[in-house]
């Protein structure tokens, strides 16, 4: 099997694993008698894990172990943890296992990115073609756990623990396949101490002004972006869209198209403009949701346009962000740098977004009594999200000054390395 095919299959299974359990988890937990608060904490596991684990694993991988071997170990551990989590019937038994599983899974996002980056000749050209298989994997997991069983005449498996068992099996599969991936050895031989283990050496990248602006804007953007994942399905259903869950997959299909088109856009317009376009389209998407409804053809079309813009905003910002980080990070800390952006976005940013969105919907946008069939002031919520993203876009446009021909790896000399390891007082 050619290297590109191996990397594509790796990315397919990586995102199939997450999609298999994440989308339908609330159905099984609610049917099993878990409270709304317990379900919320269960979904927060990935954000908590993204804070605790990726940089640690990235720093160890950068120094000691080949990335594909670390991937294999994490996948095997995750398979066991998810299998046992699927057997639980109480929150006290389920939550610790799901959190432990998430701690094994979230670092693999950065690991698979690093393995792909290290084994393609042209990152800007080749990575989007490989990463698009992750989106296809996510869609495939939805089909496997949603439509396919019913099409074959079986009962719906979404409200059961079967999607979790599928996740466990898929994790074991990728664990085995990882040993057949291209060897991606550690790039650094520096001293290992507690600061390096915690990934604090990657924080030295923040001394670069443009990288700091990028990092800060990525963190802020993750908060309003989380509103889409939490509320879009409920909003679309409440305003009258039938089978909203199915129609929302249009966002993933548009993601495939724009992922494949990403090399053209980055070459033609440059990384800064593509990142900015990702922010702008996210704000426009929420703008469509402000005025969307199922009452008229035009307002109904706005709902679909908002869904389709998800692919544009996600690809143009976050996929481009991973490419930018790979360009900026020195070779010996690229995995840790990918972990840093995962920590920033899927970790702190998403967790704060989930909490902010939930509190605002409960305290500010919930109607005491239904108004025109709506239980929430959805327009107010989407307006807040759109304005927040627009402000982030303006900040990014003003303060991020790096052009494509200036994007080079941040120089880290021996003194910098000594500082991160506590050898210079």
Q: Where do the PLM segments sit?
A:
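Juxtamembrane intracellular "pre-TM" segments in multi-pass secondary transporters
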Residues: 1, 181-216, 416-422
């Amino acid at each position: 099997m050619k290297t590109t095919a191996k990397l594509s299959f790796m990315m397919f299974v990586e995102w199939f694993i997450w999609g298999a359990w994440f989308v339908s988890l609330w159905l099984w937990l609610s049917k099993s008698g878990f409270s709304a608060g317990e379900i919320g904490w269960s979904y927060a596991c990935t954000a908590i894990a993204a804070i605790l684990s990726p940089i640690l694993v990235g720093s160890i991988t950068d120094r000691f172990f080949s990335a594909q071997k670390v991937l294999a170990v994490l996948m095997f551990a995750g398979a066991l943890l998810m299998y046992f989590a699927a057997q639980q019937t109480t929150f006290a038994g389920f939550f610790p296992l799901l959190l432990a599983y998430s701690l094994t899974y979230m670092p693999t996002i950065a690991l698979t990115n690093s393995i792909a980056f290290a084994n393609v000749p042209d990152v800007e050209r080749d990575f989007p073609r490989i990463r698009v298989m992750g989106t296809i994997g996510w869609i495939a997991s939805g089909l496997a756990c949603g439509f396919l069983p019913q099409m074959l005449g079986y009962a719906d498996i979404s409200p059961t623990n079967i999607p979790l068992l599928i996740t466990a099996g898929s994790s074991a599969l990728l664990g085995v396949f990882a040993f057949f991936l291209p060897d991606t050895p550690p790039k650094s031989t520096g001293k290992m101490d507690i600061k390096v283990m915690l990934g604090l050496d990657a924080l030295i990248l923040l001394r670069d002004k443009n990288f700091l602006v990028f990092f800060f804007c990525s963190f802020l953007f993750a908060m309003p972006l989380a509103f889409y994942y939490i509320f879009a399905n409920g909003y679309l259903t409440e305003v009258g869209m039938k089978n909203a869950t199915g129609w929302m997959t249009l966002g993933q299909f548009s993601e495939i198209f724009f992922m494949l088109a990403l090399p053209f856009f980055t070459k033609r317009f440059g990384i800064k403009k593509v990142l900015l376009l990702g922010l702008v389209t996210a704000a426009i998407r929420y703008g469509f949701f402000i005025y969307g409804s199922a009452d008229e053809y035009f307002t109904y079309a706005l709902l679909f346009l908002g869904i389709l813009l998800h692919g544009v905003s996600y690809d143009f910002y976050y996929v481009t962000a991973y490419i930018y980080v790979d360009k900026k990070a020195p070779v010996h800390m690229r995995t840790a740098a990918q972990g840093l952006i995962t920590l920033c976005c899927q970790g702190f940013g998403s967790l704060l977004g989930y909490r902010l969105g939930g509190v605002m919907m409960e305290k500010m946008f919930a109607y005491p009594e239904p108004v025109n069939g709506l239980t929430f002031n959805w327009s107010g919520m989407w307006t807040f999200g759109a304005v927040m993203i627009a402000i982030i876009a303006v900040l990014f446009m003003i303060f991020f000054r790096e052009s494509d021909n200036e994007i080079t790896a941040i120089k880290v000399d021996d003194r910098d390395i000594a500082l991160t390891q506590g050898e210079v007082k």
